[in-house]
Swiss-Prot record:
Domain PPIase FKBP-type as annotated: residue spans: 166-245
Main location: cytoplasm
Entry GO CC: cytoplasm
Protein name per the record: Trigger factor
Gene: tig
Stored Pfam families: FKBP_C, Trigger_C, Trigger_N
Tagged with keyword Cell cycle: yes
Location in or out of the cell: Cytoplasm
PANTHER family: TRIGGER FACTOR CHAPERONE AND PEPTIDYL-PROLYL CIS/TRANS ISOMERASE, TRIGGER FACTOR-LIKE PROTEIN TIG, CHLOROPLASTIC
MF-aspect GO terms: peptidyl-prolyl cis-trans isomerase activity; protein folding chaperone; ribosome binding
Organism: Bifidobacterium longum (strain NCC 2705)
Length: 459
């Protein structure tokens, strides 16, 4: 097999593969045997028709067609391996030459155009030192958590005064465009100052009492008229203020397993410290990946990027075609970073010769299945059927490579070595492989299967 590679772009190549007759013959023989199982030829038992008879009765073109369909993907994979090309998308095949008869010496020739991972020269990581922040737990952090817990036990009490920031108003909303009502809602509970609904609503409600109403101009953020300006009428039905419990031992015993407020605060501080250490580990991960990319120009495959941006926009707006410039720019920035991170981690896994075992992949997929409440074996079969197994293997490899790389690096905070063993040990490896980033490919299939199950239940 002769393989030539032409670089079309830094991330796109065109392979031309020429196959010798003796390499194609096994595929032709296999095609004849498969066809023999499907046809009836007088004088021969089904499945036992000689190849020459198949060529004569069915036609060599049919044999060659089936052989080429089987041969091209397999030979393409061998060509990628031989030339050390790492594809990032499905190829575009163009079969140019095919033998027309059993005696035809014409060689099978095809091209494959595919987006690939660019060559990435990673720095040596042994002995590398990376500075990160020192985890801190301030009194304000404890106070914020304590206040959040306190708010969970708060009650809403009606007040006879104008609404102010922090109050909860029960409101009716009506939106009009050119005098026509396009949307309305009644009995909506809204916290003033939360800015979780229409822009301008907080300002409109500030100072209104129960029974009063006003209008303001706002941009609709959902529905058929998303993005359009509308005149919004808002009426206040009632105003309630949040009444919080007093911070004392009684509150501590009611809100937690502790008898005193001091014990509760100590536990909150401990939890805050653990969270701070977790954030430090995340910072270390991000700093490590950034260090690997330092000084490198890493091009991004255009087609892969376009597809990922489209998927990103689907999660940002109901109609991606109506996405704003800001949304498109945000999606492109996110996708480019994700792609560069993925490509760097793939290169790192290769550099460190990371091996992904069958049990690694099974444990990874089983953890995703568990999150979705699905049978692991059924889920894994679905992953295979949907062609996602390769993606799962790749994700596990990235995770293992990342952890192995971070173990080889020294992280420091204020000049002191940081011990990240709790996050980089074997247990952490399991947790990392279950992360949202690593689970993306498998979770997509899980969503699809869950949707199908819901549809069946609805029937």
């Amino acid at each position: 097999m002769k393989i030539s590679v032409r670089n079309l772009e830094p991330t796109k190549v065109k392979l031309t593969v020429t196959v010798e007759p003796e390499e194609l013959n096994p595929y032709l023989d296999a095609a004849r045997k498969e066809i023999a199982k499907q046809v009836n030829v007088p004088g021969f038992r089904k499945g036992h028709v000689p190849g020459k008879i198949i060529d004569q009765r069915i036609g060599f073109a049919a044999v060659a067609g089936e052989a080429v369909n089987d041969a091209v993907p397999e030979l393409y994979s061998k060509a990628l391996e031989e030339k050390k090309i790492r594809p990032m998308a499905q190829p575009e095949f163009d079969v140019q030459d095919v033998p027309q008869s059993a005696n035809d010496e014409t060689k099978l020739k095809f091209t494959a155009t595919v987006e690939r991972r660019p060559d990435i020269e990673l720095p040596e990581i042994d002995g590398l030192e990376i500075a990160i922040s020192k985890p801190e737990v301030k009194d304000e952090d404890v106070d914020k958590r304590l206040e959040a817990l306190r708010q969970r036990f708060g009650t809403l009490v009606g007040v006879d005064r104008p609404a102010a920031k922090g109050d909860f108003a029960n409101i009716d909303l009506t939106a009009e465009i050119d005098g026509e009502t396009v949307d309305s809602q009644e009995g909506v509970s809204y916290e003033l100052g939360s800015n979780t609904m229409l822009d301008g609503l907080d300002e409109a409600l500030d100072g209104l009492s129960a029974g009063e109403e006003t209008t303001f101009e706002g941009t609709l953020e959902a529905g058929e008229h998303e993005g359009q300006k509308a005149t919004v009428k808002v009426k206040v039905n009632s105003v309630k203020a949040e009444e919080l419990p007093e911070l004392n031992d009684e509150f501590a015993s009611e809100a937690s397993e502790f008898d005193t407020l001091d014990e509760l605060k100590a536990d909150i501080r401990k939890a805050a410290a653990q969270d701070a250490e977790g954030r430090q580990a995340t910072e270390a991960r991000d700093a490590f990946i950034a260090k690997l990319q330092e000084g490198l120009e890493i091009p991004v495959p255009k087609g892969v990027k376009a597809n990922m941006v489209e998927e990103q926009l689907k999660g940002m707006t109901p109609d991606p075609e109506k996405a704003t410039k800001e949304q498109k720019a945000q999606a492109e920035e996110t996708v480019e970073k994700d792609l560069r991170d993925q490509m760097v981690l793939d290169a790192l896994a290769e550099k460190l010769d990371v091996q992904v075992s069958q049990s690694d992949v099974f444990n990874f997929l089983a953890s995703i299945a568990q999150q979705y409440g699905m049978d692991p074996n059924n889920f894994i079969q679905a992953i295979i059927k949907n062609g996602q197994l390769g993606s799962a293997v790749q994700e596990v490899g990235r995770s293992k490579g990342l952890l192995a790389g971070m173990r080889a690096v020294k992280f420091t905070a204020d000049g002191e070595v940081v011990d990240l063993s709790a996050f980089l040990g074997e247990a952490a490896e399991d947790e990392e492989s279950e992360s949202v980033e690593a689970a993306s490919a498998a979770a997509a299939v899980a969503d699809e299967l869950s949707a199908k199950d819901d549809a069946k239940d609805a029937e």
